[in-house]
A protein has these predicted regions:
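N-terminal localization/anchoring segments of enzymes in phospholipid and broader phosphate metabolism
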Residues: 1-198
Length: 198
């Protein structure tokens, strides 16, 4: 991406591009973005795109909660896994501690989905590392579609149940080359957790 051309269009964009490039982040072109200002529309769009996955799906969430939202997503993931799509899931142990049963976790694994639990909670954990959490909320589909934002997987994020009042949060979908940056982030975390790709 040409930083000079960006600077001509907007000095602020040029400064941001320079900042990112200096820190060795990749900049992408050929990318469209769609904004979702609430959970229900995001989940509808996510399920639609998950159905189209052909090669792989990466999902990384702080909270994955049992409920109707997860049931809809899991039904599609099971179908795609049975069709040969590789599915890798990272969930934060503390975020899902009371929201995901051992039975559901086993069902996910039994469906052929590779799962990694980030920073498992146990009684001997050092207080310093207890707060070391994975708050990412991303999904990557075939390296071409990526979602990132503030919405976890749970019914309250779609306002199907009320836990803390009406839930207002957002997510963006990137379609195109820019989705690859999220795929790289996920793969780096997967490898950091001691896992490998076939």
């Amino acid at each position: 991406l040409n930083q000079t051309a960006l600077t001509r269009r907007s000095p602020a964009w040029g400064r941001l591009a320079a900042y990112l490039q200096k820190r060795q982040f990749w900049l992408y072109r050929n990318t469209d973005a769609a904004y979702f200002g609430e959970g229900e529309s995001f989940f509808r769009d996510l399920v639609e795109h998950l159905r189209q996955a052909e090669t792989y799906i990466f999902m990384e969430y702080y909270i994955l909660a049992e409920g109707t939202v997860w049931d809809e997503i899991f039904a599609v993931l099971k179908e795609r896994a049975a069709a040969g799509v590789e599915i890798h899931l990272i969930i934060d142990d503390f975020g899902t501690l009371t929201r995901l049963s051992d039975g559901t976790l086993q069902a996910i694994k039994d469906a052929g989905i590779e799962v990694e639990i980030f920073n498992p909670v146990h009684r001997y954990i050092n207080r310093l590392y207890f707060n070391y959490r994975d708050h990412r909320k991303i999904t990557v589909i075939d390296g071409y579609v990526a979602y990132a934002g503030g919405i976890n997987i749970g019914d309250e994020y779609a306002n199907r149940i009320e836990r803390f009042g009406y839930w207002k949060d957002s997510t963006v979908r990137l379609t195109g080359d820019g989705a690859w940056g999220f795929a790289v982030q996920f793969m780096q975390m997967w490898k950091m957790l001691g896992r490998h790709f076939p």
